[in-house]
Amino acid sequence: AEGIHLNDPLMSPIYETCAELGMPLNIHVAEPYWMYLPDDKYNDGLMNGKKWKIDMSIPGMQSHEQLIAQFSEAVKNHPNTLFVACHFINCSYDLSIVGRLLDEYSNLYVDMSARFGETASIPRYMRKFYTRYADRILYGTDNGMSAEMYETTFRILETDDEHFYVPDYHYHWYYSGFDLPD
């Protein structure tokens, strides 16, 4: 809530300097959507809610929608700056938002880091999404560099394996492979 937001004019010198240097700006936007939702039976992220939660009762706290809108405005206002939004812009709950922004802004890229828990349960949709935006999705990780992490990543991206679990990722959804083309 406090501080400078992504669409604040005070951020413009950073964006413009990145553009002048041809340096992409890797940026985190918001948090996963469920962190902003009430703790009730409809909140899929509730299992992680004790550890990760946004307290929306704090005066001035920005909603998920507001943060995405501010980011979108910053990307729009700085077309010569390359933005790389981590974690599918934290919109993995509705990737049509990501698709709309990628379609609208040619200077926007996303990374896939730490979002298989939300996306590997919808493999057909993800295969289409990754295929459509193949040149705009970057690899990233927030999960360390263990052999198991890479094996899981490649299993999801490259195979058509169905309904498997990865216990150390702390999600209750199953995973399925996207069977992406080369």
Please give the residue ranges for each predicted region.
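H/E-rich (His + Asp/Glu) clusters that bind or coordinate divalent metals
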Residues: 66-73, 82-182
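Divalent metal-binding pocket/active-site signature
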Residues: 1-97
